[in-house]
Amino acid sequence: MMAVWPTVGMAKRNSKQRIDPLIEESPALLELIAPARSRDSGNTILAKEFRGGVLVMTGANSAVGLRSMPVRYLFLDEVDGYPLDVDGEGDAISLAEARTRTFARRKIFLVSTPTISGASAVEREYEASDQRRYFVPCPHCSHRQWLRFEQLR
């Protein structure tokens, strides 16, 4: 698995502020991933090893971090903040997606706050997709609905 943020610094911050607390508060994950304090634990700021896999975290500003490792599951966060060209090797989204090409059943998840319409990477990717939406049942009547921000409380 690979998770990509706009910069390596953001990847480190998200690892410390989101991923580590998630592991520490989840008994199932805590059982799978050795504490960072353990010698040779496989648990570093930018990599979390577990039986059967590894979560590698990197920044979209690092061509080195976006190459050489095949990944079946790819999470791209805040893609509108990605550089248009990474070290002369191309755009970060394409470089990251190239890591998944060897897997027939790959999963790629792009997330971002859209920026300028017409220039937004997440808007472009959504327009190029099949534009599926996730529907959830209403807790009152069970009607399946697409969640919108204005519906959240």
Predicted regions and their residues:
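Phosphate/NTP-binding elements of NTP-utilizing enzymes
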Residues: 1-153
